[in-house]
């Protein structure tokens, strides 16, 4: 039986690896998701068949409740709520790792729940794994819950700063590590293990609270990596090779994705790890219009429809405003009606647009937009000078030309979509208010830029109607 279980773990690990590989391409993402799901089912089945399982009653109850909650969330959560869902699931993974580490500590402790006076010979490797599981799992759980709250509007999406932010975070981490050393020296110290857990939970809040709502894609990616690392350390606690491999895969892929997104924002990974993300700017009201250079020109739906009648290429840049307005279906209708007129229609996706990695891709895919229409910043940037019209929907800082030349700007050096190089730029926003970097977007006042004010869904639907009426 033991050999069969280990073989099953090996096969499921291979499925996880291929699953992640296939998830790297939109065309094979469904296959990758299926492979990973099959691998997880096999891993769960092998674990339940392990001879160390003494009773199945609570396992069955937990599986039924968890499956029911998962199904309800899957069916009830709209695509626009995916960032919140991902954040919450990351938290559940971290919370599970924390609980498993605590449970294993108390299971191994001969003086719990009754002090027997027996020596507690906690193996060093197991003790280290337990402390790391508590630290990483605790940070992941509370950090992910704060991220969920920010995305859901339950917690302010603004940057929240507090005195001695970085030193305090560093001190708390060192306290946890020092406590871990003391646990190895005296494993019977139950209050200390609870203190380590509590500090880890507090640390998660303090690390994520300073992160602004617009920087959630990086935070979600990093927390996803943490959840994988927490799972991997829990695998060491339990001596489960499958959990070690699966957690390592998630942790490594999450770190790689986080690093890529940091480069896309011209920020350092260490700044994110220490909870200092978004320190360059804060949300706030629009500055006095007198400080702006020039005057923004506007266009209405009828005029824009007439403009689009005479072009041959259109690129749409989606942003968080499209997600908030749930305008992806209206944008797809715009694509369909313009392509019928022979217009080359594409999408330009910035790596950190939205509130989670791949947020815009998920929304557009849900609206049945073909994958080959979604181009990355690297693929589309050189083609903007040859583009007749760019329509920016709810994006702001990722198209601000100040990032290229204004060294005093908080977004200076951040790679952006060079939409200002196009012949005409249409910006759909509710107002001229600033983005999350807290600065004006000079693009709004460029001679080739026109503001198309209004809610994204309503504005795109009205535009489609006007085009059809021509």
Model-derived segments and spans:
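Mobile "lid/hinge" segments at catalytic clefts and subdomain interfaces of large enzymes
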Residues: 212, 227-270
């Amino acid at each position: 039986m033991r050999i069969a279980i280990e073989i099953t773990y090996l096969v499921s690990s291979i499925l996880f690896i291929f699953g992640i590989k296939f998830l790297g391409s939109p065309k094979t993402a469904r296959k990758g998701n299926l492979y990973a799901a099959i691998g997880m089912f096999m891993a769960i089945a092998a674990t339940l068949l392990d001879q160390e399982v003494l009773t199945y009653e609570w396992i069955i109850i937990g599986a039924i409740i968890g499956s029911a909650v998962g199904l309800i969330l899957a069916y009830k959560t709209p695509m626009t709520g995916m960032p919140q869902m991902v954040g919450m699931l990351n938290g559940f993974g971290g919370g599970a790792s924390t609980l498993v580490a605590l449970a294993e500590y108390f299971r191994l402790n001969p003086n719990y729940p009754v002090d027997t006076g027996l020596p507690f010979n906690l193996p060093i490797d197991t003790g280290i794994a337990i402390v790391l599981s508590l630290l990483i799992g605790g940070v992941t759980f509370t950090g992910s819950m704060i991220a969920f709250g920010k995305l859901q509007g339950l917690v302010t999406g603004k940057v929240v700063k507090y005195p001695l932010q970085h030193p305090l975070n560093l001190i708390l981490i060192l306290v946890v590590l020092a406590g871990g050393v003391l646990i190895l020296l005296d494993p019977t110290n139950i209050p200390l293990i609870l203190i380590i857990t509590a500090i880890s939970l507090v640390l998660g809040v303090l690390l994520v609270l300073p992160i602004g709502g617009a920087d959630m894609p990086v935070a979600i990616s990093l927390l996803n990596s943490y959840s994988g690392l927490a799972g991997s350390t829990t695998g060491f606690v339990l001596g489960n090779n499958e959990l070690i491999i699966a957690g390592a895969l998630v942790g490594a892929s999450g770190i790689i994705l986080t690093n890529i997104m940091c480069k896309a924002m011209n920020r350092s990974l260490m700044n994110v790890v220490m909870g200092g993300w978004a320190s360059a700017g804060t949300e706030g009201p629009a500055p006095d219009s007198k400080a702006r250079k020039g005057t923004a020109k506007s266009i209405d739906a009828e005029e824009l429809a007439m403009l689009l009648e005479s072009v041959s290429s259109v690129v749409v840049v989606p942003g968080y405003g499209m997600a908030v307005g749930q305008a992806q279906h209206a944008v797809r209708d715009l694509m369909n009606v313009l392509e019928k007129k022979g217009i080359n229609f594409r999408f330009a996706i910035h790596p950190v647009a939205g509130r989670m990695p791949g947020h815009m891709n998920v929304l557009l895919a849900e609206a049945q937009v073909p994958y080959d229409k979604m181009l990355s910043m690297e693929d589309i940037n050189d083609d903007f000078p040859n583009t007749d019209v760019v329509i920016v929907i709810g994006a702001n800082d990722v198209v601000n030309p100040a990032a290229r030349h204004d060294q005093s700007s908080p977004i200076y050096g951040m790679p952006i979509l060079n939409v200002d190089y196009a012949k005409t730029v249409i910006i759909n926003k509710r107002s001229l208010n600033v983005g999350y970097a807290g600065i004006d977007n000079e693009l709004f006042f460029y001679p080739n830029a026109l503001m198309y004010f209004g809610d994204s869904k309503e504005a795109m639907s009205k535009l489609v109607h006007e085009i059809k009426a021509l």
